[in-house]
Amino acid sequence: MSRQMWLDTSALLEAISEYVVRCNGDTFSGLTTGDFNALSNMFTQLSVSSAGYVSDPRVPLQTMSNMFVSFITSTDRCGYMLRKTWFNSDTKPTVSDDFITTYIRPRLQVPMSDTVRQLNNLSLQPSAKPKLYERQNAIMKGLDIPYSEPIEPCKLFRSVAGQTGNIPMMGILATPPAAQQQPFFVAERRRILFGIRSNAAIPAGAYQFVVPAWASVLSVTGAYVYFTNSFFGTTIAGVTATATAADAATTFTVPTDANNLPVQTDSRLSFSLGGGNINLELGVAKTGFCVAIEGEFTILANRSQAYYTLNSITQTPTSIDDFDVSDFLTTFLSQLRACGQYEIFSDAMDQLTNSLITNYMDPPALPAGLAFTSPWFRFSERARTILALQNVDLNIRKLIVRHLWVITSLIAVFGRYYRPN
C-alpha cells in the first residue's frame, strides 16, 4: 500500500479514536444506537472486525494495534514500506501480510470529507467545545516536514563541558560581576539574550558574540530586538538597560544577513542565527549591556535558505528538540515498558532504520561511520545523525529523514491501543 494510502487510512483511524473517546477521554458512556451504527460503518471501511466493540470500542482497535506492531517489527513483512518506491507508489505491496489483507484496504471507498461529516453530527454526551485530543494529532505531523512548528529556545539549550547550564546561569547573572567584560549567551521563553556584564564602563565600538551550537539551528520571525536587564524575571547584574533618544544607534549583523539590523526600535526583524558569530556595533558607552531577541523561533530548515541545504543541521553536533513527536508516542512507550518489550522493539526499530537507509544506497549497504546513539523515538537526534553523513548525497539524506518521519508518525497512530496478550 502506498504512502498516501497509509496516511489516509491512519487519518480515518484518528477519526475513530476521537469518536470513541470524546465523551470523557477514557470512558464510553453516552454512546447511542446511532453512534454505534456510525462507528460500525467506520470499522467496516477499514475491514476491522467489530466483535466486542459494543462493550468497549477499544477492542478492535487493540487488535489492530497488536497486528501493526507485529507487522512493523518484522522487516521482511514491512519491507515494501522501507523501499524508495514506497513514497511514489500507488499499488498494493507484493509482500503478503495479515495486517494489510485483514485490516487495511488498498483503497478507501468513503472520502475523508464524508468521515469528517459523520464526526460533525455526534449525539455524544456533553462536550461544549469538542476538540481533537492532542495525542491524536500525530498523523498531521506525517503530512508535513518536521521543521514547521515554533519552538522555545530554552528547550534547545544543552550544557556541555566547560559551560554552565541555562537555569544555573540565572543565579550567576544576578550576582554582581567581579571583573570587566564577562560575555554571556542564554535563552528563555520566546527570547534569546546575549551581552557583556561589567563592573565598569564599556566603550562604544564593535563586539563579537559566538553563537553556540544549540542556537545555530534557529531562525526567528517578527522579532523585537532591544536592551534589557531581565532574565526569567530576575534582574541581571552588571548591565545597563536605560537609553535616551539622543543615543547613537546600536546595530548588529548575522552571518546570513549583511544588513545592519537595529537594536531598540519598533522594527520587526526576521533572520537566522546559523553560520557563525553575531557582530554588534555598540553606539554608546554602557556599564555592561544585554540584548534580547524576542520573536517566534523555528528550526532553521523552516524559513530560510538552510532548508534547501540543511547546513544548519550538519554543523557542530547539538541535541535539538525532537519536534514533540515523542509526546504522541507516550501511550505506546508506556505499554512497551509495562510488558517488558521496550528493548525488543528498540532493536527492531534499529534494524528497520538500517534497512531503510540501506535501500537508499547504491549499491545497497550501510554508509561508513553510521552509528545511532539516541533511542528510536528521539527523532531529531536520529535525523541529525543521518544528515551528518557527508559521504551520502544531500537529497538522499533528506529523503531518508522524510521517509523515517512518516513511519514514526504511523507508529504513533497505530500503536496507540497496543495491549499485548
Swiss-Prot record:
It holds the Pfam family Phytoreo_P8. Keywords: Capsid protein, Host cytoplasm, Host-virus interaction, Outer capsid protein, Virion. One of its GO terms (biological process) is symbiont entry into host cell. GO terms for molecular function: host cell surface receptor binding; structural molecule activity. It comes from the Viruses. The keyword Signal does not apply. Transmembrane segments: none annotated. GO terms for cellular component: host cell cytoplasm; host cell cytoplasmic vesicle; viral envelope; viral outer capsid. Belongs to the phytoreovirus outer capsid protein P8 family. Capsid protein which self-assembles to form the outer icosahedral capsid with a T=13 symmetry, about 70 nm in diameter and consisting of 780 molecules capsid proteins. Homotrimer. Homomultimer. Interacts with host peroxisomal glycolate oxidase (GOX). This interaction mediates its relocation to virus factories peripheral to host peroxisomes. This is Outer capsid protein P8. It comes from Rice dwarf virus (isolate Akita) (RDV).
